[in-house]
Amino acid sequence: MAGIVGYGVYIPSYRIKVEEIARVWGDDPQAISRGLVVEEKSVPGPDEDTATISVEAARNALRRSQIDPSEIGAVYVGSESHPYAVKPTATIVAEAVEATPEMTAADLEFACKAGTAGIQACMGLVDSGIIKYGLAVGADTAQGAPGDALEYTASAGGAAYVIGGKNCLADIKETYSFTTDTPDFYRREGMPYPRHGGRFTGEPAYFKHVLGAARGMMEKTGLSADDFDYAVFHQPNGKFYLKAARKLGFESEQVKPGLLTPVIGNTYSGATPVGLAATLDVAEPGARILAVSYGSGAGSDAFIIEVNDLIEERRDLAPSVAEIIKNKRYVDYALYAKFKGKLRMA
């Protein structure tokens, strides 16, 4: 089965603290931080969008992969915040990394799991022999209405993965998906912000699908939580992530490396891919990782990944997630609102 030849991440440098958002809306910042397990989140600059984030992440992935970009046969960008309604983000990324023109490209949408859907698509094309390498990106500049609970977590960032059959720094040993029609979160065409079902987004949506995919994978492979060195889950907030881990029998040491929501918020399509990248940054050869995404609507993709010796040669060829996160500067709510386009002139 195909594996990970290279991976890369990009997170905007701007940050806003939970306290600053709470100050504007008269909320209790300590209660929010405790309830969501979030302290601050990333904010895209005025010149950043899903396309620019995807390009930066892809370039970092190619640095680690050490391949010729012209050998990439497919580029998929998964997001729910593509900058154009009719104009693919994937072609922008492909052109920027010099993968064009002998390749296919497409934008994918499935709420927050579109990035892992792209990984699966690349795996299929690689394993079938149609392409040599595929590039899958999960990135977002997430939306949250002013004053809505989502505003405390909806952030920006993304990760890219070069998928191939040889010279892999990690092998994808198995994949498994769990999908139903569950309308927990949606945004119609023309709506500036999504709507969500509040508590309905928990048990019947996130937990049903994340746990369903993880348990389905374990049943399929005969593995249990004790058989994994690390686990990464979709992280709309830190609370859901840690609760899912406990329900599946994972210890905090297994899931802590991939938990990034407390310091960058929920990067939506980037959440699981970025968390996986942070885990690959610290994993030793031979480590086994369980990664489970989630997308509202709703579905989860699960992967079993085993790290190879090549990780030690390529890990330092691009910035680590920790290094990228450390590069930050804070903004107040006024600048945040300006950057996010929340202030609209008549």
Swiss-Prot record:
Record-linked CDD domains: init_cond_enzymes
Positions bound to CoA: R199, K239
One GO BP: farnesyl diphosphate biosynthetic process, mevalonate pathway
UniProtKB keywords: Acyltransferase, Isoprene biosynthesis, Transferase
Binding locations of (3S)-3-hydroxy-3-methylglutaryl-CoA: D28, C112, T153, T201, H234, K243, N266, S296
Active site residues of this protein: E80 (proton donor/acceptor), C112 (acyl-thioester intermediate), H234 (proton donor/acceptor)
InterPro entries, sorted: ACP_syn_III_C (IPR013747), HMG_CoA_Synthase (IPR004656), Thiolase-like (IPR016039)
Single Gene Ontology MF annotation: acetyl-CoA C-acetyltransferase activity
Record has Transferase as a keyword: yes
Top-rank lineage group of the source organism: Archaea
Enzyme Commission code: 2.3.3.10
Reaction(s) catalysed (UniProt annotation): acetoacetyl-CoA + acetyl-CoA + H2O = (3S)-3-hydroxy-3-methylglutaryl-CoA + CoA + H(+)
Pathway: Metabolic intermediate biosynthesis; (R)-mevalonate biosynthesis; (R)-mevalonate from acetyl-CoA: step 2/3
Family: Belongs to the thiolase-like superfamily. Archaeal HMG-CoA synthase family.
Subunit field text: Interacts with acetoacetyl-CoA thiolase that catalyzes the precedent step in the pathway and with a DUF35 protein. The acetoacetyl-CoA thiolase/HMG-CoA synthase complex channels the intermediate via a fused CoA-binding site, which allows for efficient coupling of the endergonic thiolase reaction with the exergonic HMGCS reaction.
Protein function: Catalyzes the condensation of acetyl-CoA with acetoacetyl-CoA to form 3-hydroxy-3-methylglutaryl-CoA (HMG-CoA). Functions in the mevalonate (MVA) pathway leading to isopentenyl diphosphate (IPP), a key precursor for the biosynthesis of isoprenoid compounds that are building blocks of archaeal membrane lipids.
Name this polypeptide is given: Hydroxymethylglutaryl-CoA synthase
Record organism: Methanothermobacter thermautotrophicus (strain ATCC 29096 / DSM 1053 / JCM 10044 / NBRC 100330 / Delta H) (Methanobacterium thermoautotrophicum)
Organism lineage: Archaea, Methanobacteriati, Methanobacteriota, Methanomada group, Methanobacteria
